[in-house]
């Protein structure tokens, strides 16, 4: 008990946390980190009182503007009128953390924290910043003028100090350095997954794969970065029956209308349906009903959903702009260049024409790969190293 009482306090300040689910992988990373490292660190959260950018209603199952016990962490949910620098300052003083962890570079909460630290309005404390893919070319191309302006301002005002940066992969490390320069403390640790995904999985529950048909799922927040509109043109060339269900929050209504207009012109053998957001506890039971997972994303720093898909026996059909590479050599899917739509047509046609036996082998390998990857002890070790490195670095400001 004494050991638990002496754990270093890590204050995580983020836009969204449990019981939410619509903000996707960034939220899952935090929840998994708390679950797996909660015996080593005393996690506290300051977060908003609602779920994602599309849902503005406050949670009804937590106490707002008070501390709540959520799993292995204490969580303070800010009402909209209390998302202010002065409120953050008081809460940081109250917690008196050993380190602060931020999971977005562009969040208003991050701006508040970095400004408070720079102006010495709070006690000096190490800052860990995990930008969660925000520096990928695809992500930066969206609202690029606003983002570039903020990057220039942050540098000129010297808000970045001696931050400890957490990248989920070597490719994300390179993206951060390309934008902010190489003179940074960047540590690489994969985003924290759960210890096992879909423990009671049964291969027999997968749907039969008939030659000439395939069921695919696009499970993601629906936004321009996920690049669904790009996929529609290659789909026109596919012979045979192909259905794609879009599962996730339609975060960009204008973008969805653009896509919908194209969807309405698709040939009759291509079926595209929208299913809306899926609560996280239902994700695996949903994924297992599909043959393949598809996502032509402009960039992902990690992609929890890829692990969930493979754990559900769904081979991946994704762009080559994620850390999950060489999938074809591993026999668990395909990572394809967006520059060559023809390669997507070839793979999609192959999937449609695959026999049940061929599909079963591919599905089994995808599941086995995910299970073995999740067992790696280096996942916890590398994430603990990031937190311990920051704690041992002193205030850093």
What annotation goes with each model-predicted range?
Residues 28-31, 214, 218-237, 254-257:
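A conserved mid-protein helix/loop that constitutes part of the nucleotide-sugar donor-binding site
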Residues 48-53, 193, 219, 243-260, ...:
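Glycosyltransferase donor-sugar binding loop
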Residues 147-165:
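Membrane-proximal helix-turn-helix segments that form the acceptor-binding/catalytic region
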């Amino acid at each position: 008990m004494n050991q638990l009482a002496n754990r270093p306090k890590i204050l995580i300040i983020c836009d969204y946390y449990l019981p939410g689910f619509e903000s996707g992988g960034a939220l899952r990373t935090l929840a998994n980190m708390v679950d797996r490292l909660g015996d080593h660190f005393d996690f506290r959260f300051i977060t908003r009182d609602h779920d994602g950018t599309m849902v503005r209603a406050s949670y009804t199952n937590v106490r707002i503007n008070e501390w709540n016990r959520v799993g292995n962490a204490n969580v303070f949910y800010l009402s909209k009128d209390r998302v202010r620098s002065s409120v953050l300052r008081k809460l940081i003083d109250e917690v008196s953390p050993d380190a602060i962890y931020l999971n977005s570079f562009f969040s208003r909460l991050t701006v508040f924290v970095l400004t408070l630290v720079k102006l010495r309005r709070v006690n000096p404390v190490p800052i860990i910043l995990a930008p969660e893919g925000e520096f990928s070319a695809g992500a930066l191309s969206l609202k690029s003028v606003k983002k570039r302006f903020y990057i220039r301002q942050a540098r000129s005002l010297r808000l970045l100090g001696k931050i400890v940066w957490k990248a989920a992969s070597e490719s994300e490390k390179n993206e951060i350095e390309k934008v902010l320069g190489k003179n940074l403390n960047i540590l690489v640790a994969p985003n924290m997954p759960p210890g096992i995904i879909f423990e009671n999985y049964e291969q027999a529950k997968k749907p039969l794969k008939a030659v000439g048909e395939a069921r695919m799922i696009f499970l993601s927040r629906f936004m321009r970065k996920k690049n669904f509109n790009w996929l529609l043109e290659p789909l026109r060339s596919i012979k045979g029956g192909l259905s794609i269900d879009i599962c996730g929050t339609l975060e960009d209504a204008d973008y969805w209308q653009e896509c919908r207009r194209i969807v309405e012109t698709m040939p009759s053998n291509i079926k595209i349906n929208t299913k809306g957001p899926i609560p996280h506890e239902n994700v695996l039971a949903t994924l297992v009903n599909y043959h393949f997972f598809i996502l032509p994303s402009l960039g992902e720093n990690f992609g929890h959903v890829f692990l969930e898909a493979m754990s559900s026996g769904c081979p991946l059909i994704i762009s080559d702009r994620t850390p999950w590479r060489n999938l074809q050599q591993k026999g668990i899917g395909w990572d394809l260049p967006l520059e060559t739509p023809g390669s997507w047509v070839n793979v999609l046609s192959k999937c449609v024409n695959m026999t049940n036996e061929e599909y079963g082998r591919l599905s089994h390998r995808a599941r086995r790969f995910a299970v073995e990857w999740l067992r790696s002890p280096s996942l916890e070790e590398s994430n603990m190293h990031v937190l311990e490195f920051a704690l041992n670095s002193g205030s850093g400001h």
